[in-house]
Design a protein with these regions (language model features):
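Short alpha-helical
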Residues: 15, 43, 76-79
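Non-catalytic, surface beta->alpha helical segment in thiol-disulfide oxidoreductase systems
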Residues: 56, 61-90
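Local sequence-structure signature of Cys/Sec-based thiol-disulfide redox active-site neighborhoods
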Residues: 1-29
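Thiol-based oxidoreductase modules, predominantly thioredoxin-like and allied folds used
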Residues: 9-11, 32-46
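Secondary-structure boundary motif
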Residues: 26-33, 90
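Short glycine/proline-enriched coil/turn segments at helix->beta-strand junctions
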Residues: 32-33, 53, 65
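Short Fe-S-cluster ligation motifs
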Residues: 43-58
C-alpha cells in the first residue's frame, strides 16, 4: 500500500503555515488519498533535513512512500496546489 503524505514544516505563530494547512485540508476533502502532517521546524526528521533546504515557512513537501516528489516554500492557492499534485501524479 502506498503512503502519500504532505508535510507542512512550520514555526511558532506562522500564520501563512495555518493558511496552507487550511488549503491542503480543503483539497483533502475531495482527494482523501493523502494525509497531512504538520511538523515544527525543530522536529523535522533527518531524512527530510538531508533532502530539503528549509529556508522559510511554510515549507510543503509531497512524499510517496517516504520519497520526496516535490516541495515548495510559501503559500499557494488551492488551484496551484492541485495543479502541482496533478503534474507530479500525486
Amino acid at each position: 500500500m502506498k503512503s502519500k503524505v504532505v508535510y507542512i514544516i512550520t514555526t511558532v505563530k506562522c500564520s501563512a503555515c495555518k493558511c496552507m494547512e487550511y488549503i491542503l485540508k480543503e483539497i483533502q476533502k475531495d482527494d482523501p488519498t493523502f494525509t497531512i502532517t504538520v511538523i515544527d521546524f525543530y522536529d523535522v526528521p533527518e531524512w527530510i533535513k538531508n533532502n530539503v533546504t528549509l529556508t522559510d515557512f511554510p515549507t510543503v513537501i509531497f512524499t510517496d512512500n517516504n520519497v520526496i516528489k516535490y516541495h515548495f516554500t510559501g503559500t499557494l492557492s488551492g488551484q496551484k496546489v492541485i495543479k502541482i499534485m496533478n503534474d507530479i501524479n500525486f
